[in-house]
Amino acid sequence: HKIGLKQRGGSTLGGRKVWFDHDVLRLNYDGRGQYLGEFQSDESILIIQNNGDFYTTDFDLNNHYDADIQRIEKYDPEKVWTAVLYDADQQNYPYLKRFTFEATAKKQNYLGDNKHSKLILLSEQVFPRIQVVFGGHDDFREPLIVEASDFVGVKSYKAKGKRLTTYTVGNIEELEPTRMPEPEDTTEPEAGDDEATNDDGDNGQMNLF
């Protein structure tokens, strides 16, 4: 039998359910505020701030959090995020990047070191679609619709990403996705089907990434 350690709210059986109260910016185990999930002792919380800073914490009730929280959730190291930003290092052209957040107690910034870079949108969709509507002297152009997963690969959060356009932009927004991730197949493979199963797995990876 697997016995968990009683640590930072951990339970001897199963995990610890954790909530975040946005009014007081504190965690609790009593059902107040946003439900973050059920945590094992080695799992952590991801905090994303409006200025692009992010960091991870444990789920200790004594933790303090800043007010300008854009997202707070259970940290998933494999979750892919899509960001569109005006890159101040690149003449404020709009860039699209896809990345995973790293576990870090020290604040990092996924928008880069230039404080003048500006976030346009941050999406957690698996297959996000981005629409660029042109403005100014380019407003006669048809809107550009980008399938983010086809446009750029998943890199580090430090990567620049890929420029969307050099034309004058009116606005950029996220559209409803037309593709959804396929549900995971939990059925046991039959004997002798190993090769077919492996092939399917490879294809699935290629489709996702």
Residue ranges of each PLM-predicted region?
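C-terminal interaction appendages of subunits in large macromolecular complexes
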Residues: 1-209
